[in-house]
Amino acid sequence: MPAVSRASPLPQGRRVPVLYPGLLTAHHVPPPTLAGIRGEKEQQLNEHTLSMRLERVAAHMPAGARLADIGSDHGYLPVALLRRGAIAAAVAGEVALTPFQAARRTVRENGFEQHISVRHASGLAAIRPQDEITAISICGMGGETIRDILASGKAHLSGRERLILQPNGGEQPLRQWLMENHYHILCEELLRENRFYYEIIVAERIGPVSYTAEQLYFGPFQMQARSPLFLGKWQRMLGEKRKVLSNLALARQAVPEARVEEIARQVRWISELLA
């Protein structure tokens, strides 16, 4: 497959403004009223129309980045970014054969074969040193899966890339890995799409960093900003955790004490957060 091109000019295309601009840091909070958006599988999505989640991921892409989109599916994100002139080149990595073939088709139909290399590979193995990647996006997977991809593919990381991660749950173990590997969380977003809550975590490897257990659980910027959407999410989670705790107490079989203590601790943290 072709390597990512550095020399040939980009095909001319219309620049499209990024939708839903803004990011969640300690100083800027996006509008919380994001409910009612239909999910990716319910839309006719393509390289022209991204889901809200992918639009928000796109908003955090450094200008002129050389992107590795891991688990690229149909390749919509890198193709859309290249059409907008937002990135210089990309690698679209996909381990599953059918999405890999779909991504190749999307790239070919847009005439971007010289600028987007579609590779059938597992995780970060899609990245080669000559790609000189400056940004990595991993979206739509569980946080633990994203963590495992990063951990198993550390040899492919230069440490200079921006990580733009959109986990479907499991944010705590992902943040734990980022902290242990000296990645600072630069900003976070929370959005609601198709009735579900999703987070976006943007991180860069800067040096040692320390987060409290609560910050790893809730997100350091999320805790500080306390947006209505964030508080609504954890109000709902509190009810679910309390129900789990009650069910564990009524369980016929013995439940590991560590499991009960973990849920009880989470209930306490959420209660204190909402107090």
Please give the residue ranges for each predicted region.
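Short alpha-helix immediately C-terminal to the canonical SAM-binding loop
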Residues: 97-101
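Class I S-adenosyl-L-methionine
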Residues: 46-50, 144-275
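Short SAM/SAH-binding signature in class I
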Residues: 132-140
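Conserved SAM-binding motif I beta-strand of class I
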Residues: 89-94
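S-adenosyl-L-methionine
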Residues: 44-64, 79, 104-130
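Conserved SAM-binding loop of SAM-dependent methyltransferases across substrates and taxa
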Residues: 74-87
